[in-house]
C-alpha cells in the first residue's frame, strides 16, 4: 500500500534486507504500519543491503498521529462499499466480546474505537449527529425516538461507546446481524429501546457515521458545545431547501456560521461554497449570489481559499470540516485563513475571536 503525490499505487514494494537470519524493512515505516493496522498484505522486495543498524528510536513514539490515523482510516472505509460501521451503546459495551464474535461471523473487524463522554449534553450531541441525516428538527418533537434513547442512556453508569469498523467477508447478502445481536442480548438490554447496537445500512449512512467517529473536528464540536444554536437551526432549514431546489450534491457552510456554532458570535445568514465542477454544472459563475431567503453562494476566485486549498479538498478532506446536523461546516482554522486573507475590519475581529478560543481549548 502506498500513497503518493500522484495517487494510489498498489505495487510500490517495501525493500526487505536480511541480517543475522532475520528480515527487516529498510523503508516504508508508514506503509508497513498501515498494512499491519488494516491486516493487508505488505508487498515486499529483497535488497542486498547487509550489516545495517536496526534502531528502535522510531518505535518509542507513535509513527502516526491520531489525526493522521483517523484520516487514513476514514479514506480506507470511505472507499470500501462493503464496509460497515457498528456502534455498540453503553448498556451493551460489557458484552463486547460476544458482539464482536457475532460480527466476525459475517464480517472482518478492521478497527475498533473506544469513545468516552463525560457529560449528558455530549451524549445528546453524539446521538443527534448519529441519526441526523440532514434533519434539522432532531429533538424538536416530544415523541422523538432519539430523545427516548438519550433519556434512557443518560441514566446509566457510563457514556462509553464502542465503534467497530468492519468489512464484509463475501459479497453474498448478509443476514440482519443487527437484529440478531439485539435478540441475543435481550435479557440484558431491552430490544424495544434500540440501545444495544446500531449499524450502517447503506453506503450513505456508513459515510455519515465515518464523518462522526473518524472526524476529529466533529468529535471536538460534540465534546465542546453544550448549547444548541436555535438561530443556526432556523437558518439551516432555508439552506436545505436551497440545496434541494438546485439538486446540489455536496457543499460546505463557511462565513460566520461556524463561529456561531462554537459560540463566538451570532451569524446572520448561511454562506456556502461548491466544488468548481458542480458550480459549473449548476450554471453558477465565480461571483457570489443569493439563492435563498437567507442562503448565499460565496465568491470562489479561483476558489474559496484563494489557491491555498481547493474547494474539492475543502469539502472532501475531513481535516478541513466538521459535521453538524449531518451538514459540513468549515473548521475555525480554515475560517481564520480565509478571514486573514480578506483582512477587513470585521474579519480581523473574527480572527481575534478564533485565536482567543483556540488558546483556551485544545483543538484537534
Residue ranges of predicted features:
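Helical scaffold of the NTase/Pol beta-like nucleotidyltransferase catalytic core
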Residues: 218-252, 356-364
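Short active-site loop/helix that positions an aromatic residue
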Residues: 29-42, 204-214, 261-262, 282
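Catalytic core of tubulin tyrosine ligase-like
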Residues: 80-234, 317, 322
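Short active-site oxyanion
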Residues: 19-24, 194, 248-250, 269-271
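Active-site nucleotide-donor binding segment shared across nucleotidyl transfer reactions
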Residues: 239-270, 274-278
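Catalytic core of pol beta-like nucleotidyltransferases
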Residues: 233, 237, 285-362
Amino acid at each position: 500500500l502506498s500513497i503518493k503525490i500522484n495517487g494510489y499505487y498498489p505495487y510500490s514494494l517495501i525493500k526487505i534486507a536480511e541480517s543475522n537470519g532475520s528480515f527487516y524493512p529498510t523503508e516504508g515505516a508508514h506503509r508497513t504500519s498501515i498494512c499491519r493496522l488494516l491486516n493487508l498484505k505488505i508487498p515486499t522486495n529483497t535488497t542486498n543491503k547487509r550489516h545495517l543498524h536496526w534502531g528502535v528510536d522510531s518505535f518509542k513514539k507513535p509513527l502516526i498521529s491520531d489525526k493522521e490515523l483517523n484520516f487514513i482510516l476514514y479514506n480506507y472505509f470511505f472507499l470500501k462499499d462493503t464496509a460497515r460501521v457498528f456502534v455498540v451503546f453503553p448498556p451493551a459495551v460489557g458484552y463486547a466480546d460476544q458482539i464482536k464474535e457475532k460480527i466476525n461471523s459475517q464480517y472482518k473487524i478492521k478497527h475498533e474505537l473506544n469513545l468516552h463522554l463525560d457529560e449528558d449534553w455530549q451524549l445528546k450531541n453524539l446521538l443527534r449527529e448519529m441519526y441526523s441525516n440532514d434533519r434539522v428538527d432532531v429533538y424538536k418533537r416530544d415523541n422523538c425516538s432519539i430523545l427516548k434513547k438519550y433519556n434512557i442512556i443518560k441514566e446509566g453508569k457510563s457514556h462509553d461507546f464502542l465503534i467497530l469498523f468492519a468489512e464484509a467477508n463475501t459479497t453474498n447478502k448478509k443476514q440482519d446481524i443487527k437484529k440478531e445481536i439485539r435478540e441475543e442480548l435481550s435479557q440484558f438490554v431491552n430490544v424495544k429501546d434500540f440501545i444495544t447496537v446500531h449499524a450502517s445500512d447503506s453506503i450513505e449512512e456508513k459515510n455519515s457515521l465515518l464523518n462522526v467517529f473518524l472526524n476529529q473536528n466533529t468529535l471536538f464540536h460534540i465534546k465542546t458545545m453544550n448549547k444548541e444554536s436555535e438561530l443556526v437551526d432556523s437558518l439551516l432549514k432555508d439552506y436545505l431547501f436551497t440545496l434541494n431546489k438546485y439538486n446540489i450534491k455536496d457543499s460546505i457552510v463557511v462565513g460566520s456560521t461556524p463561529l456561531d456554532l462554537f459560540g463566538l458570535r451570532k451569524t446572520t445568514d448561511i454562506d456556502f461554497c461548491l466544488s468548481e465542477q458542480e458550480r459549473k454544472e449548476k450554471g453558477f459563475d465565480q461571483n457570489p449570489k443569493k439563492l435563498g431567503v437567507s442562503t448565499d453562494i460565496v465568491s470562489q476566485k479561483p476558489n474559496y481559499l484563494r489557491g491555498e486549498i481547493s474547494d474539492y479538498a475543502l469539502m472532501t478532506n475531513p481535516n478541513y470540516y466538521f459535521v453538524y446536523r449531518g451538514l459540513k461546516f468549515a473548521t475555525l482554522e480554515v475560517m481564520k485563513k480565509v478571514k486573514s486573507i480578506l483582512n477587513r475590519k470585521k474579519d480581523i475581529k473574527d480572527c481575534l475571536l478564533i485565536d482567543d478560543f483556540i488558546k483556551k481549548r485544545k483543538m484537534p
